[in-house]
Structures are given as C-alpha cells and as structure tokens.
Amino acid sequence: MAQTRGGALERAAAVPAETRERIEELKSKRDAVILAHYYVEPEVQAVADYVGDSFYLAKLAKTLPQQTIVLCGVEFMGESAKLLNRDKTVLLPEPAADCPMAHMVSRATIDGARAEYGDDLAAVSYTHLTLPTT
C-alpha cells in the first residue's frame, strides 16, 4: 500500500541536488521526517522519506523516532497525524490544501440524522473528515 523513497528515485532527477541536500540538512537539524501522500507532486514525493495513503502515513508517523512530522497532503491528513501523535510537532507545508471528500458531510447533517433516527445512530467514516465534522 505504501512505498519508501526508493519508489520515487526516478523522479529525483527533477529535484536539484543542492535542494535535496538542503532538505536533508534541515531534516537532520530539526529532527524531521517528510511524509507525502500519493497525490502530491512527483517532485515532493521524490524528496519524501515515505509515500503512501492518508491512514498509512498517520499510523506510520507514530512509529518513527523523529519529533517533527512534515506531512505533505491535505488538511485532514495533518489533523489525523496530530491526533495519533500528540507529543510530536506536525507541520502541513500547504495549509490551503483541501480534499472535497472531507466536506461531503457536515456536523449539521450528522446531528440531523441523529435527531431523526435517535442518539445511538453511529456515524461511520474513513479518515476523510475534518475535525469539526467528527
């Protein structure tokens, strides 16, 4: 389901060597690891330490020793990673990155369904929801 940096090496040529070196230097200095979603640009995947889907990346972050997680993805991915890694710093390089699926249901919709069908109605979702919805 996920791949490590090795799967992105063919795209690394598009990233200048001095840029890659600077990224490695900053990662070391700030005790950081870069996680990238499959949907981000190939150049970002090329410099990421891990590439995968949102749930994999959030879980993976918990197993990594670095204290700073740079999550290249959309808002809910950063939120999920932070929920699972409260003791770590989670950075989202593009805070405006968004996923339309994360907005397909609102808190008001869930509350309305509970009002109609009862409070014991369970709302089930994959990780594609923002925190205000859950």
Each model region followed by its residue ranges:
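Metallocofactor- and cofactor-centric catalytic cores in central/energy metabolism, strongly enriched
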Residues: 2-84, 89, 93-125
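A very general structural signal that marks isolated residues within well-ordered alpha-helical segments
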Residues: 87, 133-134
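Conserved small/polar residues in nucleotide/adenosyl-binding loops
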Residues: 127-133
